[in-house]
């Protein structure tokens, strides 16, 4: 069977038949069809592809800046921590303020902390 004949046969298959073919090939050769697609996307898109796929983000306080008291107040408001815990978190920067939050929430927290004078990263 030539390549053209194989391509022609694949073109005439239904989606269900193609899905079954892929599963059979994965089992036969011990591979995953998803891996090559992910590698190709990462090569082409680089950092943007990783960002789009990520759904949970960590808000990291990199530095309190020169308005430490305002930053402590903002951290207490966001996290519900007591004064001592919030102060320890701010003084121990870089530290995670919140982990595994949505992109929208991470952006809001970052804006609020930066408004208070902090340097913030989202990872």
Swiss-Prot record:
One of its GO terms (cellular component) is cytosolic large ribosomal subunit. The gene is rplL. Belongs to the bacterial ribosomal protein bL12 family. Homodimer. Part of the ribosomal stalk of the 50S ribosomal subunit. Forms a multimeric L10(L12)X complex, where L10 forms an elongated spine to which 2 to 4 L12 dimers bind in a sequential fashion. Binds GTP-bound translation factors. Forms part of the ribosomal stalk which helps the ribosome interact with GTP-bound translation factors. Is thus essential for accurate translation. This is Large ribosomal subunit protein bL12. The keyword Translocase does not apply. Gene3D superfamilies: 3.30.1390.10, Single helix bin. GO terms for biological process: translation. Keywords: Ribonucleoprotein, Ribosomal protein. GO terms for molecular function: mRNA binding; structural constituent of ribosome. NCBIfam families: L12.
